[in-house]
Curated annotation (Swiss-Prot):
Gene: cysD
Full protein name: Sulfate adenylyltransferase subunit 2
Residue span of region Disordered: 280-302
Catalysed reaction equations from the record: sulfate + ATP + H(+) = adenosine 5'-phosphosulfate + diphosphate
Single biological process term from Gene Ontology: sulfate assimilation
Lineage: Bacteria, Pseudomonadati, Pseudomonadota, Gammaproteobacteria, Alteromonadales
Organism annotation: Shewanella denitrificans (strain OS217 / ATCC BAA-1090 / DSM 15013)
Oligomeric form and interacting partners: Heterodimer composed of CysD, the smaller subunit, and CysN.
Amino acid sequence: MAVQVLSHLQQLEAESIQIIREVAAEFDNPVMMYSIGKDSSVMLHLARKAFYPGKIPFPLLHVDTGWKFKEMIAFRDAQAKKFGFELLTHTNQEGVEQGVGPFTHGSAKHTDIMKTQALKQALNQHGFDAAFGGARRDEEKSRAKERVYSFRDRHHRWDPKNQRPELWRTYNGAVNKGESIRVFPLSNWTELDIWQYIYQENIEIVPLYFAADRQVVEKGGQLILKDDDRMPLEAGEAVKTEKVRFRTLGCYPLTAAMHSEADTLEKIIEEMLLTRSSERQGRLIDSDQSASMEHKKRQGYF
């Protein structure tokens, strides 16, 4: 009897699908976070595969800060219409009423109120006991030490010094009422794996990932896309057209573009093979305070 040898990507795919199915079977009310980025697109594709030909048996949740790229929101709505999944959106209305934004309140306060607090509001409102996220261990040092099943207490806080063991891919999903698990089925994937899988599976992604001529403003040494008229121009700043793309996506004032000629998947993969810089170097929220990401995760951020 011939033994089937799985490729590297097939092994990653099988592991992720097993995790997704396990959560769907084990938890009462799971949800999949949908940030609209490349990792979310891969995770959505894996969820569709996991339950094909049936529909995904849990909703997708997008925390809308009001500052996402316009192309991201258009892509989100198009994907929901195309695949027919249940899409929930949530915005922190208190933050909206207070006029909280990245330009007026800074990245740390904006992220806390419009992302972290909004996420906790949505999880509490719907009573979700498990939430899938597209984080990978190779992205950032605090994520590198987080478990696939990441326990959160009643306040959605993460304690990196009190994590559950995960031996032989055996995951502990036991929670009391009010507690929850954040689940990361892409934990063992790398950025290059993600791009190669997108290429292999022909997965649709937001066009912002591809290099194109775009209007940007240089702020603090970073190229910020002028996505709408809410961006203030400081003295000496001017809008200019540059050929850029994004390696990661978030709120447009807090996500820097990079110069690139990679306007196809093949060119992006070639660029990834040569790059020596961090994927998240363009995410301003990662450097707005000391140990920034770990601090945010302790407070309930994904």
